[in-house]
Amino acid sequence: MFNSYLRTIASGALLAGTCAALGVGLQAQGVKISDPTSVVMIVNRDSNDIAFMDIKTKQMVGKVFLGNNVNPHMVMMSPDGRYVVTGGTRANKAFIIDTKTLQLVKVIPTDIAPEHLAFSPDSRWYYQGNPDGDSISVIDMQSLSKIKTIPGFAEPLNVTFLPDGSKAYIGNYGAHWVGVVDVRRHELVKKIQIAEVPGVAKLDPDKYLGEIHGINIAMPSPDGKYLYAADGTLGIVGVIDPREDKVVKHIRVGKDPWRIYMGHDGKYAITPNNGDETISIIDLKTNSVAATLEAGPNMTGVNFAQGKAFVISSTSGFVYVYDMNSLKPAGRIKMGTNIQLETATTDTKEEKLYLAESTNHEVLIIDAKTNAVERVGHVGLYPWGTHIMDSKDNYCH
């Protein structure tokens, strides 16, 4: 199953060993970033580093080596631009980098196999999800220390905070519920059941009672009115009212939706449905499916720019393009042959996409207006994802 791939640590030529001591970012000595919005961050799993590429020049301005056998999964910059963080899936540690100096300033033990993460809006709290540990590690960014481990989850993936920072919502890929965390107490206070497994489960036990493809993320709408959580096994999107923390509507989408992605104008959202190779376009005003369109296999992400949606089909080598005004297909972009596309970020001007391509260790830059592609090679070994501060399309597998 492709979703198993999404949750599997990428293989590669990794050196055995423990995480190196502080100072492993020595190759970045003397490099300074005065404007945190000026760079694309690239997480390289097999070279165990975070690379920084200047958006204007497309030149590497620095790399921070994290240590041997780290296998970083996702990279994110704090909202205040002060720090860059990542979780080392094989190291069971969180790594904190000073943005201005590109120095690794702290390594903090987490629970098992840290992957996805998020910052509170005020940059105070760094929540690190640990899918194999069924927990969230809470890191205080003032003291740069782990202050708590929140237990009780089921393969937690993505974390989203309310704009006021009062609550965090945790997608549980191994269950059909979204966890609600009281950020003041750092406690799991509620489980929002997206839907019940239907009574026909006994008739199709492989689908309903086998490996669960649950909730990847509870994604807020741009206006913050609702949260949307796609359940892969059940093929639905649950609409959550955060004022009451309950599901107010179910939207039937395609088979095995991976997650939901929000358009920037607040009109539509998209679920890539890997079970039937379609996308569902959801009208956020009516909370209903406005269109179901053919797509590609093994979709890993959706980005929005220039009135279009760009849907990444990981193993086909294509990015599928859709006109978000007419809600119709607008072609596809061939990125290469026998390549593996990962995930992308969109620049803050919504002009270009920066797509990680792991086979040839490069970043592919897509011009959103013309669909032209530019390649930047030698970014690191097995680039897994990209991140730009303040982008509306920062996500991971």
State what each model feature region is:
Residues R7, G12-H397:
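Predominantly soluble domains enriched in secretory-pathway, periplasmic, or organellar proteins
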Residues M1-Y5:
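N-terminal secretory signal peptides that target proteins for export/translocation
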